[in-house]
Every structure is written in structure tokens, then in C-alpha cells.
């Protein structure tokens, strides 16, 4: 009896290990990374398609991302939004991983037309109905010059489809924007794309969607542990990253 039990346990361990290896081989992980901070982020300004550069803090965030990513394992490809804040973040990561960066316009942030460059206080004054809808709920009016939600959903869905078709397994990295990461998560996880964007995504954060035999899973959300170090504050003093505040955190 003891030998039978040991034999059954040995078979279960072997079978479980074999399934683990099999699932690992068939697993695709998509790392969605938000760009480092810009001055407009720090000022709480809407960015959208506006091509704002990383500030010094954002560059340091990108360097810390670049130092962390080799620990995550080998990557097969790096894709990035063509906007400078995302592409520069991706370049630093690419240098660390020894991979070129592939620009992809489908990773652009959603254009918000006439709202770009404005703070929440500006929007409250100039577009009160938009401000009310964002903060109180309800349907907001059309913003002149904005990208439609339908177009936004379509391009992010196409990106997910193409990545999964090209990379059946392994790790792929995409450096993009807060709003775009939200929509990529919704489409990648087969969630309702008509709902308000639900996820808080910090600058230089890591988010992981995994596809395997059991479908799509969210494995990591808004991880910034690589930023838990000292930064130089506005007055020149060193401050803990966790204590620094970014106004209007929902601004992408």
C-alpha cells in the first residue's frame, strides 16, 4: 500500500511538473508599461497626442525600469508609442535588453483635442459639462478634435490581436500611455470597453496580461516597486518617491 501511495504521488508530481512546463511554453506575457513622468504630468495637464518630453524625474524612472526589466527574463520584442515620452522610455529599456524598439501608432494615447494642455481647473472653467461628467458620472459631450472611443477601441484591439498572432509564447513589452494601457487591458481581458477607464496607472508602472490554456489573466497591475528609492525633490533635497504627489493623477 505504501508503495502504491508513493507511486501515485510520484506520478502526480511528474504530471503536474509536465503540465507546468507545457503551460509555460504556451504562455504569452504582454508587459504594458507607462512612460516616465513629464512636466505636464507633474502639472496635471492633459497630454493626449501632444508630444511632451520626459522630465528629469521621468528619465530617472525610465532608467530604473531599464535596470529592472532584465530580471523579468528574456523578451522577444519591444513596441512603443511614437510619442517622445513613451519612445524614449522604451529606448532606455531596449538598451538594457539589447532589443530595438518598434514604433507602433496604435499605442498612441487617445487624442483629446481641445482639452490637451489644460489642467482640471482649466477644464472646469472652459468645459464645465466635461468636467462634471468626468467627476460625477454620466455621458460627457463631444470634445472638439478628440479621437472617438470607437476608433480608440478599434486600434487597441487590433494591436492585441496582432501581438497574439505574431507572438504565441514568451514575453513582449509595450511602452505606452495611461489611457491606452486601460483600453489594452479591457480589450485583452475581454472586459466591457464602453465602461469608464477603471485602472489607475502610474508613470513608469508595469502591468502584465498573460494568455495561456485558461484564457487571459491579469498577472500584475500598476507595479512601481522599482521606484522605491530616493529622488531629488524640487528644492534639491532627497525625498522618498512614495511621498511625492502628482496632481490630477488621472491625467494620462
Language-model segments: which ranges?
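Short hydrophobic alpha-helical segments enriched in small aliphatic residues
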Residues: 15-16
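Active-site-adjacent alpha-helix immediately C-terminal to a catalytic or transition-state-stabilizing loop
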Residues: 27, 87, 95, 157-217
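Loop-to-helix element that buttresses phosphate recognition and phosphoryl-transfer chemistry
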Residues: 34-93, 142-157
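Phosphate-coordination/substrate-recognition cap region in phosphate-metabolizing enzymes
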Residues: 64-131, 251-252
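Short glycine/proline- and acidic residue-enriched helix-loop micro-motifs
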Residues: 130-151, 243-247
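Acidic, His/Gly-rich catalytic cores of divalent-metal-dependent hydrolytic chemistry
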Residues: 219-252
Amino acid at each position: 500500500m505504501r508503495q502504491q501511495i508513493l507511486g501515485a504521488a510520484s506520478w502526480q508530481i511528474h504530471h503536474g511538473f509536465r503540465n507546468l512546463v507545457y503551460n509555460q511554453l504556451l504562455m504569452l506575457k504582454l508587459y504594458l508599461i507607462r512612460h516616465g513622468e513629464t512636466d505636464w504630468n507633474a502639472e496635471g495637464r492633459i497630454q493626449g497626442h501632444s508630444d511632451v518630453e520626459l522630465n528629469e524625474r521621468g528619465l530617472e524612472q525610465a532608467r530604473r525600469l531599464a535596470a529592472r526589466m532584465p530580471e523579468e527574463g528574456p523578451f522577444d520584442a519591444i513596441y512603443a508609442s511614437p510619442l517622445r515620452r513613451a519612445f524614449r522610455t522604451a529606448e532606455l529599456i531596449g538598451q538594457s535588453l539589447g532589443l530595438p524598439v518598434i514604433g507602433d501608432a496604435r499605442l498612441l494615447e487617445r487624442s483629446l483635442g481641445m482639452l490637451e494642455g489644460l489642467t482640471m481647473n482649466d477644464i472646469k472653467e472652459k468645459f464645465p459639462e466635461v468636467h462634471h461628467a468626468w467627476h460625477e458620472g454620466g455621458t460627457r459631450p463631444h470634445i472638439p478634435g478628440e479621437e472617438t472611443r470607437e476608433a480608440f477601441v478599434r486600434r487597441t484591439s487590433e494591436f492585441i490581436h496582432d501581438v497574439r498572432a505574431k507572438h504565441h509564447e514568451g514575453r513582449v513589452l509595450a511602452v505606452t500611455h495611461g489611457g491606452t494601457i486601460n483600453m489594452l487591458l479591457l480589450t485583452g481581458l475581454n472586459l466591457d470597453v464602453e465602461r469608464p477607464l477603471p485602472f489607475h496607472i502610474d508613470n513608469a508602472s508595469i502591468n502584465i496580461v498573460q494568455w495561456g490554456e485558461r484564457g487571459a489573466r491579469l498577472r500584475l497591475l500598476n507595479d512601481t516597486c522599482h521606484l522605491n528609492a530616493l529622488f531629488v525633490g524640487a528644492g534639491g533635497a532627497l525625498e522618498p518617491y512614495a511621498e511625492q504627489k502628482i496632481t490630477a493623477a488621472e491625467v494620462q
